[in-house]
Amino acid sequence: MPQNNQTLLEKTVADQWQTLPSGLTVIVRPMPGYSSTHVIFATRFGSIDRDFRLDGKEVHLPAGVAHFLEHKMFEDQDGDAFAKYAKTGANANAFTSFDRTCYLFTATQQLDESLDVLLGMVTHPYFTEQTIAKEQGIIGQEIKMYDDSPDWRLITGLFECLYHEHPIRSDIAGTVESIAEITPEMLYDSCKAFYAPGNMVLAAAGDTTMEQILAACERHGLMRPRSTERVQRLWKPEPMTLAAAHKTLKMPVSKPCFGVGFKEKPLPPNDLRTEALYDLILSCITGGMSPLYRRLYDGGLVNPGFGGEVLRVDGCCCILFTGESDAPDAVKQMLLDEIARIRAAGVDREIFTLCKNEKYGQLIENLENVEDSASQMADFALSGQTVAQQITMLAGLTAEDADAALQHILDRKSV
């Protein structure tokens, strides 16, 4: 992209970045005229981060600690954070994924007070044996609900087939047995390792300014220098072979769910370009504009939920195709045949351009929404990129790039 166009794009995106003395990355997109503000406080700590070394001490966590910690952050000696948010009128939530935990809220009033709730609860954790025991029962019920979800069981089943050792095999919430092992010491160790400001991102978009967000950081000690020691994640060797060729689960469903997974070589950290390229390739193969999707859908073999996705975390990269069908074996064979055809012939240039424009448009459209803006900023910042850099990178991807990548992924031996 020409330099003048890049400068114009950065002005249009209008993200303001600061790295505080504590190491915290702060990104703000002021959106004058908007009535609400969306704020996300995110850490690079997810369900796969179970084995690590910090200050010479090795820590090995049972499955589900990151998700458990997310729940416990909302409770301290002063009561429940949701009750405090209710007083400010903010709508708050949180979630844990494989590689991150995010705390968020949307506010139309009393933004300073809501920021104090968010920053206060995340920077001042409080755990006891009694509060942990109470939460173990609550999350245990949540785990049982996930066990009854065919869609979630399908995804975890795919991971169990693809991976021998990688912790992505384990459910994000853990099991009833694994969370029973959680102690206050484990939670405090996790906070020290992963909730250090240098491992976190604070993003805000809407009716706010960088000055307002920095003032909140000042109130909660996030402007002070902190130790720069980084946690060292520990991984078991993962072979490129499959753990299992297939798996079948019997559950009460109206239509069978199916999944086809490909185990790929792990990508380098923060390689968003290759991830975006893989995503475009999947759109060309199974997206709504692809010939395969039309044949499957028009033939009644799949419903609109059929499609593919890329999952990339540390030590793991896989491509998953999922959907519902009364003839899953036929769909799988048609999928494999289409992949072989496109690998030999190359991606359709017109479809590639349409898919690329669609992705590009989604990134631009997100700039007009406070929730999507903050989420987009936090998501890319956790991988070391700005939104403008991501847009520029996407614009530079070509069909020739896709053809070259296809020679190294989606191999039948890895399915």
Where are these regions (language model features)?
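Second-shell loop/turn segments in exported
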Residues: 55, 70-72, 102-106, 126, ...
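Extended amphipathic alpha-helical segments enriched in small hydrophobics
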Residues: 319-348
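C-terminal regions of mature proteins
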Residues: 7, 201-206, 342, 353-413
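Short, conserved charged micro-motifs
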Residues: 111-114, 209-214, 269-271, 328-333
